[in-house]
Amino acid sequence: GQGSLAYPGLRTQGNLETLSGPNDATRGLTSLADTFEHVIEELLDEQQVIQPSKENKDADLYSSRVMLSSQVPLEPPLLFLLEEYKNYLDAANMSMRVRRHSDPARRGELSVCDSTSEWVTAAEKKTAVDMSGATVTVLEKVPVPKGQLKQYFYETKCSSKGYAKEGCRGIDKRYWNSQCRTTQSYVRALTMDNKKRVG
């Protein structure tokens, strides 16, 4: 991307036309899907090194949603897309097991809570709490040899429309109360503490 942090690249060789016959094509697609899923799992496993403290139950595991760039990134971060794809694979595996018994009209999937995602800078949120519980200043701009880059965060939050106030989808409101709410997560970002130390 445009002056952004480097992400690991995924490369495949050949294309579907180079495969011979339907059986070979099926084997090739299965092999490619297995390889892609294996790479995704390895990347996601590496991201689950940092654990939040037990007191902060709203905190998720560490996820990479930070990018340094000279302009607003045009796409979501790669690891976010990989997480979404893995969730899709998990849901697909589950639906394949129950597909025979399900009504065709009910096979579509909807999120329990509607959400929106966008890139934001430290201009919107100037302070944060680090993993030791200290309040730190989030750096909006980072100096580099040829100028400066902005630090962008890919923020996902509950949608202000729809089910956020009415409760979660799929919950029987006659018996249960539910609520969609945005939770906090830890990310690796450039910050400054009260002693002006940057890290």
UniProtKB/Swiss-Prot annotation:
SUPFAM superfamilies listed in its UniProt record: Cystine-knot cytokines
Pfam families tied to this protein: NGF
Keyword Glycoprotein: yes
Propeptide stretch(es), residue numbers: 1-100
Gene, per the UniProt record: BDNF
A single cellular component GO annotation: synaptic vesicle
Any GO molecular function: growth factor activity
Protein name: Neurotrophic factor BDNF precursor form
UniProt feature, compositional bias: Polar residues: 12-23
Keywords per UniProt: Cleavage on pair of basic residues, Disulfide bond, Glycoprotein, Growth factor, Secreted
Organism encoding this protein: Morelia spilota
InterPro entries for this protein: Brain-der_neurotrophic_factor (IPR020430), Cystine-knot_cytokine (IPR029034), Nerve_growth_factor-like (IPR020408), Nerve_growth_factor-rel (IPR002072), Nerve_growth_factor_CS (IPR019846)
Known glycosylation sites: 93
Main location: secreted
Free-text function comment from the UniProt entry: Promotes the survival of neuronal populations that are all located either in the central nervous system or directly connected to it.
